[in-house]
Amino acid sequence: MKKILTFVAALAVAGCGGSDAEAPTPAAEVQQAANSAVAEAGEGNPAAALAAQEITDDYMRGIIAEISDDRYEGRGPGSRGDEMARAYLAGRMQELGLEPGAADGGWEQPFELVGVNAQQPESWTFTGHDKSMTLKQWDQFIVSSGVQEDRAVIEDAELVFAGYAIEAPEYDWDDFKDVDLEGKVLLIMNNDPDWDPDLFGGETRLWYGRWDYKYLSAARQGAVGAIIIHTSPSAGYPFQVVQTSWTGVQFELPAGDEPRTQMNGWVTEDTARELVAMAGYDLDDLREAAYNRDFEPVPLGITTSLAMDVEIRRVESANLLGLIPGSDPELSDEVVVYTAHHDHLGIGTPGEDGDAIYN
């Protein structure tokens, strides 16, 4: 299996390099090293040898150009374009000599997805301390349904600042401290504490720093809602990405018995600053407190209600599984898995040029 790992890693390098064979430039040196690696990987492995010859810069660009064509309609999950992309990519795998890897002997591993389309409210109001603040959808907040039902509802729920909303026994970290958060809406910092290189991987984002962990963590505490404070440094992208990717249909695996919030959302940093100021707090001070292991949730004395209609639809999609058998019998039961996604956002709201396909 080591040969498989070397082979695929080398292809990744080769696919990113140029096809020109000029001069001793750094790119050329990388390409030459990749060529040597794939040649070694192909010894005694026909599929690897064929792939080493076929996977070139032009080949990879051709695949990307094909599936990003308008004919694939943006490859939305469960769509006609998704099905077309799977069929096309399975054909390319077969051409390269890969073997079908699905349990039924085929290329596809089918699964069900649930499309959740929350009807965004125009505004969201928070009240407390003889004050009221109404947030504007899109500019200040984006919210989605946490449930796979036709309506999501929060009624008179208190807003609580929950730090990073992390429970990590291996790091001796617990942001909740057994505080009862049943029925609350949690205001949560993005990412994880990075002040210690030995804590939460330092600047490396772990599972604890992901938005999906935050929402799941809030649900485990019995919260009815979770709002993440967006900053570009903590997210790694601007609020515009939240605006475009968290509106419209959100695809999820079918819900099981796990706890779920009613609603999950994002607010801008300036909006969060105004919200906590209603309760007499400074956002920077709350952040500083959340950097410590002794942090405890901070009730803000602010309540909110919100109801959204939700459209639910179920679709079928599939994973594509292609296998390159290894040559070492002692490692034949081990598998090195490389993953990527072929689907995308499909067809959405037209842009200024009238184009609605997210290629």
Where are these regions (language model features)?
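C-terminal motif of bacterial Sec signal peptides marking the signal peptidase cleavage site
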Residues: 13-15
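Bacterial signal peptide processing site
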Residues: 17-20
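N-terminal hydrophobic or amphipathic helices/low-complexity stretches enriched
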Residues: 22-102, 333
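Extracellular/luminal Protease-associated
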Residues: 136-255, 260-263, 325, 333, ...
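Noncatalytic luminal/extracellular "stalk/propeptide" segments of secretory-pathway proteins
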Residues: 66, 73-198, 298-301, 310-312, ...
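Long, well-ordered, tryptophan-enriched scaffold segments
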Residues: 220-233, 237, 245-318
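Sec-dependent signal peptide recognition
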Residues: 2-10
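Acidic/His- and Gly-rich active-site-bordering loop/insert found
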Residues: 67, 93, 268, 316-351
